[in-house]
Amino acid sequence: MSMHLKNKLGLDWANEKYIRNLYQELGIKGMKPVFKTTRAGKAPYGKFPYLLRNKFIRFSNQVMATDITYIKTPWGMMYFTAVIDLYSRKILSWRLSDSMKTDFCLECVKDAFEEYGVPAIFNTDCGSQYTSAAFVELLQSYNVEISMDGIGRCKDNIFVERTWRTLKYEWIFLRDYSSAEELRKSLGEFVKFFNSERIHQGLDYKTPDEVYEASLITNRLKTKPMAA
């Protein structure tokens, strides 16, 4: 918060001590994320190994990941899925559904691949949507290496979990929604905010868009042919 006020609003006096005192004065307390434990679905292809342990991610589009989070609304449960670039934390694509069917997960992945290209590795948890034949075969059709978290190991997909935490505690819980369309519009606004405005400490206080684009430029320069 302090870095956001300094970098984005020019409030150099807003240090961490000021923010802590302000939170105490307003009665604001930090919230701890509650991680879900994923149950493995029926897996016609079995469970794929987790490929990201000790893996150094060097550039954008090298590794993408996805997951589903639940949004409780007055008219029932809604389900939000997104594909995230793990190097930059950028949300590449997203979908909202009123059911947990695999279809909206498939469409979300297709959206990301069509707009941003195909990664070397794609990581998921081992939920039924991601271990289904349709999902596995989609990734295999793109020759993508499939990586899956261990059951109950939310830290294997920690950057996606942190995105859900930001979505819930900095956006969803601060707003009221009266319809699915209103929620959908708000989620689009969140994605724009998250990608282009919200700075991340883990990204050296840059936004996902800034890191993503800088990585693409660097890669273009590396692959640019030398003049004769």
Regions found by a protein language model. Give the residues of each.
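Mobile genetic element proteins and their domesticated derivatives, centered on retroelements
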Residues: 1, 19, 52, 67, ...
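Active-site beta-loop-alpha junctions of metal-dependent nucleic acid enzymes
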Residues: 72, 76, 94-116, 131
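C-terminal domain-tail junction helix/linker
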Residues: 140-144, 166-228
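RNase H-like two-metal-ion nuclease catalytic core shared by retroviral integrases
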Residues: 39-43, 124-126, 132-136, 146-168, ...
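Hydrophobic (often cysteine-bearing) scaffold residues that line and stabilize catalytic clefts
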Residues: 15, 48, 61, 80, ...
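Basic, flexible linker segments flanking DNA-binding modules
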Residues: 1-60, 207-216
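An active-site-proximal beta-strand-loop segment
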Residues: 57-92, 98-100
